[in-house]
Amino acid sequence: MTTNDAGTGNPAEQPARGAKQQPATETSRAGRDLRAAIVVGLSIGLVLIAVLVFVPRVWVAIVAVATLVATHEVVRRLREAGYLIPVIPLLIGGQAAVWLTWPFGAVGALAGFGGMVVVCMIWRLFMQDSVTRPTTGGAPSPGNYLSDVSATVFLAVWVPLFCSFGAMLVYPENGSGWVFCMMIAVIASDVGGYAVGVLFGKHPMVPTISPKKSWEGFAGSLVCGITATIITATFLVGKTPWIGALLGVLFVLTTALGDLVESQVKRDLGIKDMGRLLPGHGGLMDRLDGILPSAVAAWIVLTLLP
């Protein structure tokens, strides 16, 4: 999840050759409509807080809907780039991976994921593509099977499988606390990276992937993310401050890596955002890029340190 185009956030991606240019709009220095981003972010935050406090199991339904929307966003972008992606088994399999965690936990998530991948591999064998690959004449497309399936499996891991780990966070007795701990860490990391990166960012981290991510912004992410996690881990999940500090480092790293992965994917596809669902943010996947790997990390820690 990232609101940033500086520090540890997403860059204003440079479109690949032939990609459509997006019209310029009034934005902040980071390249976003800051006012819209704040309003949307606060609205989503208030809804999630209410759910986690009063009806925590509804979190699973929210994750399931997010899985559906984010998967569709990425599939659409991949198809625009010429990949032949089996969307129906991805959408259905993603729901299976999330909902099977309710009765079966991690076993259900892995079963849903494994079944989804197998069905996608078979489904792709019989897909027709007379639009982006017209030479097939409407017959099953024999070319690019490996690249299409590789992109499909990557997407299945990136969104449905990672989302299923996010759903499992809420099941333990203190599950809401763990979700809050992870979410607050990601938000604090983003905000700290944005502020410090915009004000002081001079040394790019990975200029070939994301030119506006700076080491100064990453330092801001570390300070804010670790501080927030120490507080939330101590008071919400009953961990010692040193465990909170380690969790903070872990969450900041997973958030930054998630941002970089999505930045690389968008650079490969020649796009700036995955979608337009959330004003000031882009698509839903542009909000989830840092959250998803952090959810996996949080579940692993929760499992190893109950």
Swiss-Prot record:
GO biological process terms held by the UniProt record: CDP-diacylglycerol biosynthetic process
Reaction catalyzed: a 1,2-diacyl-sn-glycero-3-phosphate + CTP + H(+) = a CDP-1,2-diacyl-sn-glycerol + diphosphate
Main location: membrane
PROSITE patterns: CDS (PS01315)
Transmembrane is among the record's keywords: yes
Known EC number: 2.7.7.41
Pfam families: CTP_transf_1
Gene Ontology MF: a single term: phosphatidate cytidylyltransferase activity
UniProt keyword list: Cell membrane, Lipid biosynthesis, Lipid metabolism, Membrane, Nucleotidyltransferase, Phospholipid biosynthesis, Phospholipid metabolism, Transferase, Transmembrane, Transmembrane helix
Family: Belongs to the CDS family.
Name of the protein in question: Phosphatidate cytidylyltransferase
Name of the gene encoding the protein in the UniProt record: cdsA
